Amino acid sequence: MSTKKDKFSNKDKIFMELALNLAKARHGLTGINPSVGCVIVKNNEILSIGQTGFKGTPHAEFNAIKNSNENLEGSKMYVTLEPCSHYGKTPPCTNIIIKNKIKEVVYGVEDIDKKVKGKTLKILQSKNILVKKNLLKKEINKFYTPYFFNRKNNLPFVTGKIAISRNN
């Protein structure tokens, strides 16, 4: 079960930082989908990593599971954004997490997309998977500012810069 005050170890933070760096490496290359990073760990050893594919598919969770040559049963997944729980261009990430018997999922922030928001927690907990959230919340929220703006306002997030020369 997850609470608002989940406790995280230094190793948890290190694994989530790696997931965030994976997400940052694909920033701007995932089409309309957010860039997500995923790290799968067992006994504090990294079994696999994944990130959102170019143009948004496959999702990071799917790629991390696909990239592994190990049995993932009993492992722990760190993912920057709440895993999806709906059918779209891809099946729900919650399905592949359950199928691979991952015992714990830690995600950085809740997805504000109405199709996902808060649903993952209930689905995974109903399968006795421990779920924790809000690890590195401040840093990850900052990274997803453009994505959240787009989902809230249905507009692109635009950054403009103006420069002027001193010798005019």
Task: Tell me the role of every PLM-derived stretch.
Residues 1-30, 43-46, 57, 87-167:
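Zinc-dependent deaminase
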Residues 37-39, 50, 82, 163, ...:
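Anionic group-transfer/hydrolysis microenvironments
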Residues 54, 81, 109:
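Residues that line or immediately flank small-molecule/substrate-binding pockets and catalytic motifs
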Residues 62-98:
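Short HxH-centered metal-ligating active-site micro-motif
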Residues 15, 31-39, 73-75:
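Acidic, glycine-enriched active-site microenvironments
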Residues 38, 42, 46-67, 136:
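N-terminal beta-alpha supersecondary unit
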